[in-house]
């Protein structure tokens, strides 16, 4: 039995509602929240109840399928207008995660030629389910490829949570840990706590422990010391957006780790599906970086820890330059070398 079966799914479709694993409640309680409107889906994404680029795309797809069932119009033209409004609305929830827009575009395209409302509603539900099913297979493939980069007994550092609960299943950066466990390859994770929302401390440690995988939690500012003293052999992270030249947006603090990897001469890998690539943007300078509420920094679990009125800069992501990345691990294999050329070649083959 796969080790990830022990980990609750991030998103489940109920036909007339969506059940999302409320990740703001972890690790203290495992609670599912029922979403029945497009507004609830939007809020759930913004409030990080569902998070992780692939999972955001999945819940957005289900949200659009759900919303379409509630349109009262009898005309396909009005149906399409309402649907496009909902697509645009969901797109405002988290601007950096490209899987969100990828899923929205895919849902839009699925009904472009449809002439009846009933058929459109049926196709939207089927497409959302297909997106979820495909993501599970894609993440397993990423894990298989990533595992070739490591050997039994390796200590591997990661940040944030790019695991099973951030995807349909398996995750991206955490996928090789699960595949490794299935195949008898023991990998030990060192998880950065990931301030300010503690996705590493709350989520990565929780899901790896669910699967019986060795994990050690460290504070973010311990990373250099851990690499130096704990025989860290590599760093692997997820991604929220990868552009045409390989520059990668991921959780704030990722670039710090890439710089440390360069200094300590250890590999720095990015693991992400092709749906996370945005080849319409040429460099990372074009990526819009989400900035979040100051209270994420000034308060910890609701308690004020900084003087009231303190100025806060709270970007959710940073951009790691391609020259700091050893390889980008996708479901199609590992991209190395001239990223601009190799990414263009890969997308030409898959188009």
From Swiss-Prot:
Record bears the keyword Cell membrane: no
GO molecular function, one term: S-methyl-5-thioribose-1-phosphate isomerase activity
Family matches, as Gene3D superfamilies: translation initiation factor eif-2b, domain 1, Translation initiation factor eif-2b, domain 2
Site residues by UniProt (Transition state stabilizer): 160
Record-listed E.C. numbers: 5.3.1.23
GO biological process, one term: L-methionine salvage from methylthioadenosine
Catalysis: reaction(s): 5-(methylsulfanyl)-alpha-D-ribose 1-phosphate = 5-(methylsulfanyl)-D-ribulose 1-phosphate
Annotated keywords: Amino-acid biosynthesis, Isomerase, Methionine biosynthesis
EC class name: isomerase
Catalytic residues identified in the record: 240 (proton donor)
Pathway(s) annotated for this protein in UniProt: Amino-acid biosynthesis; L-methionine biosynthesis via salvage pathway; L-methionine from S-methyl-5-thio-alpha-D-ribose 1-phosphate: step 1/6
Pfam families according to UniProt: IF-2B
Binding site for substrate: 51-53, 94, 199, 250-251
InterPro entries registered for this protein in UniProt: IF-2B-related, IF-M1Pi, IF_2B-like_C, Initiation_fac_2B_a/b/d, M1Pi_N, NagB/RpiA_transferase-like
The family this protein is said to belong to: Belongs to the EIF-2B alpha/beta/delta subunits family. MtnA subfamily.
Subunit structure: Homodimer.
Main function: Catalyzes the interconversion of methylthioribose-1-phosphate (MTR-1-P) into methylthioribulose-1-phosphate (MTRu-1-P).
Protein name from the UniProt record: Methylthioribose-1-phosphate isomerase
Organism the protein comes from: Bacillus anthracis
């Amino acid at each position: 039995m796969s080790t990830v079966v022990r980990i609750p799914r991030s998103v489940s479709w109920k036909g007339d509602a969506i059940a999302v694993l409320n990740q703001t409640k972890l690790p203290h309680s495992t609670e599912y929240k029922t979403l029945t409107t497009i507004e609830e889906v939007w809020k759930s994404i913004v409030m990080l109840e569902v998070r992780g680029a692939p999972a955001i795309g999945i819940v957005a797809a289900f949200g659009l399928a759900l919303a379409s069932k509630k349109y009262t119009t009898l005309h396909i033209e009005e149906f399409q207008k309402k649907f496009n409004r909902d697509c645009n609305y969901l797109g405002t929830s988290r601007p950096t995660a490209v899987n969100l827009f990828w899923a929205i575009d895919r849902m839009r395209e699925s009904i472009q030629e449809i002439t009846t409302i009933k058929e459109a509603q049926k196709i939207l539900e089927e497409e959302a389910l297909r997106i979820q099913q495909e993501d599970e297979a894609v993440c397993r493939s990423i894990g298989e490829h990533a595992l070739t980069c490591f050997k039994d007994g390796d200590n591997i550092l990661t940040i944030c949570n790019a695991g099973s609960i951030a995807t349909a299943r398996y995750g991206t950066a955490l996928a090789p840990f699960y595949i490794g466990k299935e195949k008898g390859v023991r990998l030990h994770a060192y998880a950065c706590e990931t301030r300010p929302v503690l996705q590493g401390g709350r989520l990565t440690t929780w899901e790896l422990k669910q699967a019986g995988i060795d994990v050690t939690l460290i504070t973010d500012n311990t990373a250099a010391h851990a690499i130096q003293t704990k025989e860290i052999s590599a760093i692997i992270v997820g991604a929220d957006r990868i552009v045409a030249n390989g520059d990668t947006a991921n959780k704030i603090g990722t670039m710090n780790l890439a710089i440390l990897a360069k200094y300590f001469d250890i590999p720095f890998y990015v693991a992400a599906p092709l749906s996370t690539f945005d080849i319409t943007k040429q460099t990372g300078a074009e990526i819009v970086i989400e900035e979040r509420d100051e209270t994420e920094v000034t308060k910890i679990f609701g308690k004020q820890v900084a003087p009231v009125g303190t100025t806060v800069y709270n970007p959710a992501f940073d951009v790691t330059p391609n020259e700091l990345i050893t390889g980008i691990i996708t479901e199609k294999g590992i991209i190395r070398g001239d990223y601009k050329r190799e990414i263009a070649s890969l997308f030409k083959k898959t188009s």
